[in-house]
Design a protein with these regions (language model features):
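Acidic, glycine-rich loop-and-beta core segments that form the ion-binding/anion-interacting portion
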Residues: 217-305
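A general structural motif at alpha-helix termini
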Residues: 60-61, 217, 273-275, 362, ...
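A helix-coil-helix interface module used to build multimeric assemblies
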Residues: 1-203, 208-214, 221, 277-278, ...
């Protein structure tokens, strides 16, 4: 039977134990391999300050690499009676190496241990989100360029308003993602700071070398003040949640548009039948369930910052068990967002557009502004031109000129997609993921 790291000479009530452990054993599986990475950096530093012998370090690192491989394959489990991944890793080391395995916790608390686990996990997941956003972005830019000359109605108040184009529609969401990437970058920069060495939130009497662990783990810098490092629990999750919610907001709006444009009353876009679902009673149905679920999941993700804030917003300085509950909403959110991004990219790639929407005369009035502008350009006062065209429409005499010429930046005839791509590339170049990746490879080699 495994012993708890904090166990003394009394037994905790089983119901209290069940309630306080909660879902920790399950959720910590997300963090297991990152716990190993943190331990590898920590013990390397311990050896450098004389708290471990060189041969002890070599044996511990070798065994930690074995545990990492198990976790990386998804085979890591917390044994019965083990509270969390920290305890399980220490138990596995002790089972293999005896008392040597008990030395890895010197100068460390589970508080800074889980902080570093969360940061290592989160920065890895943020990179995967960034990669998925870029794939969707590229699909949108490609579609925007492909259909840049195909007009569609633009709407205000859900009323036909002015000419738009598929180039503008696809490109608008691409630029939205380029802006969202700035939020992801800010979240990554705030995440990629080392809390290790803050212990329970008040530091340690051991002469820890925090600069060394910062470099070993590929962090950009550290959370310098040990009290602030602990205060960062919850704050980091909230900041990342805001960035994820921003991406989700773009996805939700795009999914709503796609559902609406796909319905028979609009008929602007068509989804391949293999990307739709059917009805058990209506044989003609081809439902856009993928976009409906992207919309629902993305709307759910937009509540994530509020969920995190409501757990942490009335906590004073220091660690509290309340913070464990954040894991329940935070850790699974990455897979949900990645899934939505991947599905959106896949279905956007397959989407077909109706290139003859404007053959329908019901869209003729949206060219009225073009006519007003032409009359004004020819010298008629704008208000007189507006009234003249309005009266023609009311009398059923308006004859649209559908040959439009928009040339300013960001308009139908000048999408500026190359500028939008430059925005995205600039932001991507400033993440510097290679620092993280190289550090982790170096630890594991």
């Amino acid at each position: 039977m495994a012993h708890k790291l904090w166990e003394k000479n009394f037994e905790v009530n089983k119901e209290i134990e069940r309630f306080t452990v909660g879902r920790d054993r399950e959720l910590d599986l997300y963090l297991a391999k990152y716990d190993v990475l943190g331990s590898m950096a920590h013990i390397t530093m311990l050896e450098s300050i004389g708290l471990l012998e060189k041969d002890e370090l070599a044996q511990l690192l070798a065994e930690l690499k074995n545990i990492y491989a198990i976790a990386d394959k998804g085979e890591f489990v917390n044994e019965d009676g083990v509270e969390d991944d920290h305890s399980q890793v220490e138990l596995m080391l002790t089972q293999k190496l005896g008392d040597m395995g008990k030395k890895i916790h010197s100068g460390r608390s589970r508080n800074d241990q889980v902080l570093v686990d969360l940061k290592l996990f989160t920065r890895h997941e943020l990179k995967e989100i960034v990669d998925a956003v870029k794939i969707l972005f590229d699909e949108l830019i490609q579609k925007s360029n492909q259909y840049k000359d195909v007009l569609m109605p633009g709407y205000t108040h859900l009323q036909v308003a002015m000419p738009s184009s598929f180039g503008l529609w696809f490109g608008a969401y691409a630029e939205g993602l380029a802006d969202d990437m700035l939020f992801l970058q800010a979240a990554y920069r705030m995440t990629n700071r080392n809390p290790l060495g803050s212990a329970a939130g008040y530091g340690s009497s051991f002469p820890l070398n925090r600069t060394m662990t910062t470099e070993l783990l590929g962090f950009d810098s550290m959370d310098y003040n040990v009290v602030y490092a602990q205060m960062g629990r919850g704050k980091m999750e909230r900041n990342v949640a805001f960035a994820m919610a921003t991406v989700a907001g773009t996805l939700a709006k795009m999914a709503f548009d796609a559902c609406m444009f796909n319905c028979q009353n609009f008929g602007f876009v068509k989804l391949p039948k293999e990307c739709t679902t059917g009805s058990s009673i209506m044989p003609h149905k081809k439902n856009p369930d993928v976009f409906e679920l992207i919309r629902a999941k993305s709307n759910k993700l937009q509540s994530l910052p509020q969920q995190v804030m409501l757990i942490m917003n009335n906590l004073p300085v220091g660690y509290f068990r309340d913070l464990q509950i954040i894991k329940e909403v935070f850790l699974p959110a990455f897979d949900e967002l990645k899934d939505c991004l991947q599905m959106a990219a896949y279905i956007i790639n397959k989407m077909e557009v109706n290139e003859h929407i404007l053959d329908d005369p019901r869209y003729d009035p949206m060219f009225s502004v073009e006519e007003v502008n032409q009359l004004a350009a020819n010298g008629m006062p704008f208000r007189d031109a507006y009234k003249t065209v309005g009266l023609e429409i009311e009398a059923g005499e308006f004859k649209p000129n559908k040959d439009i010429h928009h040339t300013h930046e960001g308009s139908i005839g000048n999408l500026c997609n190359e500028k939008i791509q430059e925005l995205m590339e600039k932001t991507l170049s400033e993440f510097h993921f290679e620092r993280m990746e190289n550090a982790e490879k170096e630890l594991l080699k």
